[in-house]
Amino acid sequence: VTAAFEKHRMETEVHVDRLEEVFEKFGKSARGKTCPAIDGIIEEGSEILEDYDGAPALDAGLVAAAQAVEHYEIARYGTLVAWAEQMGKADVAALLKATLKEEVATDEALTGLGEGGVNQRALQAAA
């Protein structure tokens, strides 16, 4: 689970670079902005860390929280791709599609972790 999170953290740096490029194509400067939805998901993840620290359910809970973030990002990038295409901005759409593809791949990898044993270990420990 830790390796998957680290891999995605590094991918996120590339995603930020792409977003900065998208903003440049519109003649704008990118800026960080707080997202209450993501903040809520992160808060849930923090609660999972507190409640299940050291327990087998911890990894399952963290995978679930990470997938919630991925699903939010997939929804947002999907919308941005559609808007870019409708605006005739194929170059922007291509940048956003690259990130969308990586977000979907991360979600699939997280599903693989869950189905590959993380969820089962949590269930066995709870029984």
Where are these regions (language model features)?
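Amphipathic alpha-helical hairpins
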Residues: 1-127
